[in-house]
Curated annotation (Swiss-Prot):
Transmembrane segments: none annotated. Residues 32-51 bind DNA. Keywords: DNA-binding, Repressor, Transcription, Transcription regulation. It comes from Mycobacterium tuberculosis (strain ATCC 25618 / H37Rv). One of its GO terms (molecular function) is DNA binding. This is HTH-type transcriptional repressor KstR2. The keyword Transport does not apply. Controls the expression of a small regulon that may play a role in the utilization of cholesterol. GO terms for biological process: regulation of DNA-templated transcription.
Amino acid sequence: MDRVAGQVNSRRGELLELAAAMFAERGLRATTVRDIADGAGILSGSLYHHFASKEEMVDELLRGFLDWLFARYRDIVDSTANPLERLQGLFMASFEAIEHHHAQVVIYQDEAQRLASQPRFSYIEDRNKQQRKMWVDVLNQGIEEGYFRPDLDVDLVYRFIRDTTWVSVRWYRPGGPLTAQQVGQQYLAIVLGGITKEGV
């Protein structure tokens, strides 16, 4: 019984991975249940054995990704010694997500705004607010403790970091000439060069 359950869960995971790649490449609207079933070599009806709808697949992909990301973020905020190290950790965790959850990040970037208006996906807006608060708190702490320049517009810095980080998923490809960590370190050096207080 457990072995069968494991096989079902494994197949479900394979189908989710396939769906994520298709959603990221084609977009949610352009990807049908039939497309996913054809890609998996099964009938559409067989896909419904694993998922009630395409929306369930998207929900599971985004929830899983956001749960993972925020667990990483919380761990960094709770375990690092100072705001500078926290900012560095949050920054690099975002690039880790781009490397290891590439399709989910693309889906999130392309579809989150539209999906957030649907009751099933209301958690997306909550997560966006939590993300903003986490980053803004770290930036404010960094200013208060003398790590970052006191004249910074924290909201502007947050938006700059958010947009430059997540938009890189559009051109970055896992397995390319640079790892996400290398890209993240270069981006981080540019950001820190602009916000750190002299002498830090």
